[in-house]
Amino acid sequence: MGGISIWQLLIVALIVVLLFGTKKLRSLGGDLGGAVKGFKNAMSSEEDKKALEDTEAAKTAQTTQQATEKKPESNKEQA
């Protein structure tokens, strides 16, 4: 008592199919699937962008660090 049984779920599903029809439910399912796929693609492209930006930032930091390390050596040679 208090829980939803399998029979109650089947009756609700049958009523939904009778009200909307299988074609409309199929197109609704396809639209929902397309929306989920688009959302996943957008999320993965955002992750790719962040990874690319992080990689570029690391390269820039490494280049800057190397340039900074080379400057004191050139100053020592001049003195």
From Swiss-Prot:
Belongs to the TatA/E family. Keywords: Cell inner membrane, Cell membrane, Membrane, Protein transport, Translocation, Transmembrane, Transmembrane helix, Transport. Residues 46-57, 68-79 have a biased composition (Basic and acidic residues). HAMAP family: TatA_E (MF_00236). The chain crosses the membrane at residues 1-21. Residues 58-67 have a biased composition (Low complexity). GO terms for biological process: protein transport by the Tat complex. Residues 43-79 are annotated as: Disordered. Gene3D superfamilies: 1.20.5.3310. GO terms for molecular function: protein transmembrane transporter activity. Its main location: membrane. This is Sec-independent protein translocase protein TatA. Disulfide bonds: none annotated. The gene is tatA. Part of the twin-arginine translocation (Tat) system that transports large folded proteins containing a characteristic twin-arginine motif in their signal peptide across membranes. TatA could form the protein-conducting channel of the Tat system. The keyword Cell inner membrane applies. One of its GO terms (cellular component) is TAT protein transport complex. Pfam families: TatA_B_E. Coiled coil: none annotated.
